[in-house]
């Protein structure tokens, strides 16, 4: 713990202009990034008496050992640079917007050659468009079931697609016309892309054109006395209307807007966002944010920060998706028209709407609006509605934020009490200096010494931190069908803590111009500079799955590396005994102990993660062919070879001259293939 007075800038050295500042810890890592209209005024707040600071702020300034700043020309540039640095450095003490990923969504993998629509629940991925979220999983599946009548988009997994592609016949959905069957070439890549574009356009809110088209097609078929086709179009029209009727009109003027509200208590804030397109609610999202202050101005700044970070991330994601679509489109015959369609759609369906309606105004509305305007490339209106339907909807969103916060508080109190008790029990039972806020656990998985792998799982504050999970292929302690569990544990511990020591020695690269003034062009920093050093912080407790031998091996590695500030234990499966280094007898925790339960959770999670990775490795090995290891023989040539001879077994019967007859196989490669398939043969012989 450092004393802020030791690194407080000298009086008069801090400028009074707008800027962005960074606090760094003893290893030089950026732990907090902030912006200010007046740098001197803002930074002086951090060097007050520690007793008057918010606990989180107090912890930050006592962790830091230096502060730096960059002067910019305007507050808009400060907002943009703050966002850039937060994305770049991922500071530990900056506010984390914890997205509520429990709601299901309808996803479309537009980055694939043949995109598919599917049910999804989780974080966003590149090359995928998301629609929703929905309140229930069945709502996603019902929507998909109804829409595939009108837009027969692919919905199967890659494995199913490849299987039917090789079989040459479609699945059931292809037979009943709820899939266009691109797997067997019933439609081309460009034709399927048109279906996908129509599906995405409908989900984005452009429903009227679909209704008009189906109505006209139904009437035309009826007039042509094609009553069977007219009946199909009628059913399609009813399916579309059923979906649109499920979404009530909340704004009669057909507005495109996002409506946002914040509800807060002393510890956290709940942010709710409703996406309104063409006057109908198309989606709802929620976040929980930790507060650093209890003032009204802090909530205003929190909302401002959220608006900039949320829409900047959405625009970046949209650009990545569109770039993938363009890459796919370049393989199609209608490249020019599809690129034009994408460009038009980017303008018409920007992720930043024309109106951003907020229940209460954010800090510095003008500057916030300027940033959003630059993201949209056209006008954006950020305002608090005062009356009518828009005010009523803003109140509804605020009520949702209050309810989300209430539900979170109930869960928070229950979870926090239990987790605190568990960490306190571990603290007391092991005689640690403080409760272990970061705990790591490793486990080994293999079958009779094959595909030996290890997992490393991380819990912080008693909760899984899955972004820090790691998987290891055991290299030194395994091989030739043999496995040494004790040696494998030692290898994992050595690799993990060698990484820790290396990360601690790394000095963050600098591409900032501290103390300089700059305009917009200097805001475009390098995105590759700040690799997240997730393992630069050591755990307070490290757990190995095993008994005394595994613990002793792990302790030897820690001693070898000079790691003295990490507590080590092992948990034996049979009796759930806790083993400590150098102890002859295990520690027995009560069966009803919350501390034991948390340790078991870590052990079970490490086991689950390890066995999942082991199965993946085993599956990949079983799918491998002897042809995969031949140098110079890529996937395309392997496919041609197997297709020519019918199987690897038949290929083995072929001579070198017969192998050379295959298109793309030269004499040298044919010889390499023959030798690989006949390892006991004389290499010098020519068939």
UniProtKB/Swiss-Prot annotation:
Alphabetical keyword list: Cytoplasm, DNA damage, DNA excision, DNA repair, Excision nuclease, SOS response
Subcellular location: Cytoplasm
Primary location: cytoplasm
Complex and partners: Interacts with UvrB in an incision complex.
Chain ranges of the UVR domain: 208-243
Pfam families reported in the protein's UniProt record: GIY-YIG, HHH_5, UVR, UvrC_RNaseH, UvrC_RNaseH_dom
Superkingdom of this protein's organism: Bacteria
Record function comment: The UvrABC repair system catalyzes the recognition and processing of DNA lesions. UvrC both incises the 5' and 3' sides of the lesion. The N-terminal half is responsible for the 3' incision and the C-terminal half is responsible for the 5' incision.
NCBIfam families for this protein: PRK00558.1-5
Name of the protein this chain belongs to: UvrABC system protein C
Entry's family note: Belongs to the UvrC family.
Molecular-function annotations in GO: DNA binding; excinuclease ABC activity
CDD domains: GIY-YIG_UvrC_Cho (cd10434)
Species assigned in the record: Corynebacterium diphtheriae (strain ATCC 700971 / NCTC 13129 / Biotype gravis)
């Amino acid at each position: 713990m450092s004393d802020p007075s030791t690194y407080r800038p000298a009086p008069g050295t801090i400028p009074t202009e707008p800027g962005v500042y960074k606090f760094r810890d003893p290893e030089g890592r950026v732990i907090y990034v902030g912006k200010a209209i007046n740098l001197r005024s803002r930074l002086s707040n951090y060097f007050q008496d520690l007793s008057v600071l918010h606990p989180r702020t107090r912890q930050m300034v006592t962790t830091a050992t230096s502060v730096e700043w960059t002067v910019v020309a305007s507050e808009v540039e400060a907002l943009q640079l703050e966002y850039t640095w937060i994305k770049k450095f991922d500071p530990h003490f900056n506010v984390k917007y914890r997205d509520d990923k429990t709601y299901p969504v309808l996803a479309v993998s537009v980055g694939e050659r043949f995109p598919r629509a599917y049910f999804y629940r989780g974080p966003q991925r590149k090359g995928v468009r998301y629609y929703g979220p929905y309140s229930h999983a069945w709502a996603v599946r019902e929507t998909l079931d109804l829409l595939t009548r009108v837009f027969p988009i692919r919905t199967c997994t890659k494995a199913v697609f490849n299987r039917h592609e090789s079989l040459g016949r479609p699945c059931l959905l292809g037979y009943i016309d709820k899939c266009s069957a691109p797997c067997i070439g019933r439609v081309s890549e460009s034709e399927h892309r048109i279906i996908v574009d129509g599906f995405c356009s409908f989900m984005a809110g452009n429903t009227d054109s679909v209704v008009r088209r189906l109505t006209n097609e139904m009437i035309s078929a009826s007039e042509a006395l094609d009553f069977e086709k007219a009946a199909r179009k009628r059913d399609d029209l009813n399916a579309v209307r059923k979906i649109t009727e499920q979404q009530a009109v909340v704004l009669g003027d057909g507005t495109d807007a996002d409506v946002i509200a914040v509800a807060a208590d002393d510890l956290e804030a709940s942010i709710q966002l409703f996406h309104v397109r063409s006057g109908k609610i198309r989606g709802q999202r929620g976040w929980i944010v930790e507060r650093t202050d209890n003032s009204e101005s802090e909530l205003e700044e929190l909302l401002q920060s959220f608006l900039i970070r949320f829409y900047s991330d959405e625009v970046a994601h949209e650009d990545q998706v569109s770039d993938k679509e363009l890459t796919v489109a370049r393989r199609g015959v209608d490249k020019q028209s599809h690129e034009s369609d994408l460009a038009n759609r980017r303008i018409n369906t920007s992720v930043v709407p024309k109106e951003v309606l907020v229940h209460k105004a954010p800090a510095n509305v003008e500057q916030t609006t300027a940033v959003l305007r630059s993201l949209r490339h056209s006008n954006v209106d950020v305002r608090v509605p005062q009356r009518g339907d828009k005010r009523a909807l803003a109140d509804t969103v605020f009520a949702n934020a209050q309810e989300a916060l209430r539900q979170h508080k109930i869960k928070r109190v229950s979870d926090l009490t239990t987790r605190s008790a568990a960490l306190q029990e571990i603290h007391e039972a092991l005689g640690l200096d403080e409760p272990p806020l970061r705990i790591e656990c490793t486990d080994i998985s293999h079958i009779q010494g094959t595909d030996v792998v290890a997992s490393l799982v991380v819990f912080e504050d008693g909760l899984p931190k899955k972004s820090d999970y790691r998987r290891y292929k055991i290299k030194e302690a395994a091989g030739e069908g043999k496995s040494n569990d004790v040696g494998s544990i030692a290898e994992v511990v050595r690799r993990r803590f060698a990484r820790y020591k290396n990360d601690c020695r790394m000095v963050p690269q600098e591409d900032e111009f501290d103390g300089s003034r700059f305009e917009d062009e200097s805001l475009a920093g390098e995105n590759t500079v700040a690799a997240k050093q997730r393992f630069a912080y050591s755990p307070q407790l490290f757990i190995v799955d095993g008994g005394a031998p595994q613990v002793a091996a792990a302790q030897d590695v820690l001693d070898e590396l000079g790691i003295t500030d990490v507590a080590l234990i092992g948990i034996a499966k049979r009796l759930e005994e806790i083993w400590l280094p150098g102890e002859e007898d295990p520690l027995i925790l009560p069966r009803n102990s919350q501390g034991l339960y948390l340790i078991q959770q870590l052990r079970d999670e490490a086991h689950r993660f390890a066995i999942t990775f082991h199965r993946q490795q085993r599956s990949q090995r079983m799918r491998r062919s002897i042809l995969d290891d031949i140098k110079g023989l890529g996937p395309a040539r392997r496919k041609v070879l197997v297709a020519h001879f019918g199987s690897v077994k038949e290929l083995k019967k072929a001579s070198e001259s017969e192998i050379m007859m295959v298109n793309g196989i030269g004499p040298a490669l044919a010889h390499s293939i023959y030798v690989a398939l006949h390892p006991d043969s004389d290499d010098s012989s020519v068939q």
